[in-house]
């Protein structure tokens, strides 16, 4: 069981992770160190990794398995859980308690998931349990998935046609935001990715100006270039634009 205030506060979670980092590395965790370890813990839970799979990741992140276990043990001893644990335990309950599962299925007769490319493997697993009668509508674009470091699982969109009985897949191929020049170049670039649905994107905003390729020598130079462009547009565009 959990105490009423079972959810660990972010400041306490941050201190816990920093303490664990200190014990394993013998030095203070920088903000980057904290973010990396915090993201790794989130990734493990959202991707539902086994102990063996965690050890495979450890090739790139020394002591990850031990630090993850230390983190989980500390939460357990304090009768607390983090946000990701809430999904882990929710999935456990749905799998083990048919009464709870059937009750939720009756309550949520239809399910709509927006920005589905950003959802994780454990979230898709929970959704699949709840949407057992093809009563699911998912809106997403695997081409726009940019949160892999946070365990986004766009592969679930590709598996949608296999996980559900006779699903209807609607491709939205008209772009109302960008000009044809931008859409064409973006499609040429993303088509190199083979893990996607084929699309034939078209623009509703005309041809537009040609896309320019700009080379910079560093990330800082990239930021300065973008800042210069922003300042130029601020000076030249009408105030109402």
Predicted feature residues:
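P-loop NTPase Walker
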Residues: 1-3, 102, 155, 167, ...
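Conserved P-loop NTPase-based nucleic-acid remodeling module centered on helicase motor cores
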Residues: 1-39, 66, 70, 74, ...
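Conserved phosphate/pyrophosphate-binding and hydrolysis machinery centered on Walker-type P-loop NTPases
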Residues: 7-10, 27-34, 54-61, 80-84, ...
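Conserved helicase NTPase motor core
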Residues: 9, 58-159, 174-178
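Short glycine-/polar-rich loops that comprise or flank the Walker A/P-loop
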Residues: 16, 132-135, 141-143, 163-169, ...
């Amino acid at each position: 069981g959990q105490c009423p205030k079972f959810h660990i506060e972010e400041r306490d979670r941050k201190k816990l992770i920093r303490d664990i980092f200190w014990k394993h590395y013998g030095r203070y965790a920088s903000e980057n160190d904290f973010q990396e370890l915090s993201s790794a813990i989130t990734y493990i839970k959202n991707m539902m990794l086994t102990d063996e799979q965690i050890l495979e990741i450890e090739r790139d992140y020394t002591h990850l398995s031990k630090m993850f276990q230390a983190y989980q043990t500390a939460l357990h001893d304090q009768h607390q859980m983090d946000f990701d644990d809430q999904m882990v335990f929710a999935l456990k309950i749905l799998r083990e308690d048919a009464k709870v599962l059937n009750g939720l299925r009756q309550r949520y007769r239809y399910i709509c998931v927006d920005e589905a490319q950003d959802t994780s493997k454990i979230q898709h697993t929970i959704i699949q349990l709840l949407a057992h009668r093809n009563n699911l509508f998912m809106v997403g674009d695997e081409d726009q998935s940019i949160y892999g470091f946070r365990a986004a699982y766009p592969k679930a969109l590709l598996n949608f046609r296999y996980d559900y009985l006779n699903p209807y897949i609607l491709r939205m191929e008209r772009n109302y935001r960008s000009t044809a020049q931008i859409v064409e170049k973006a499609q040429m670039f993303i088509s190199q990715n083979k893990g996607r649905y084929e699309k034939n994107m078209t623009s509703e905003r005309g041809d537009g100006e040609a896309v320019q390729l700009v080379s910079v020598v560093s990330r800082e130079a990239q930021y300065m270039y973008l800042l210069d462009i922003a300042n130029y547009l601020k000076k030249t565009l009408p105030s109402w634009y």
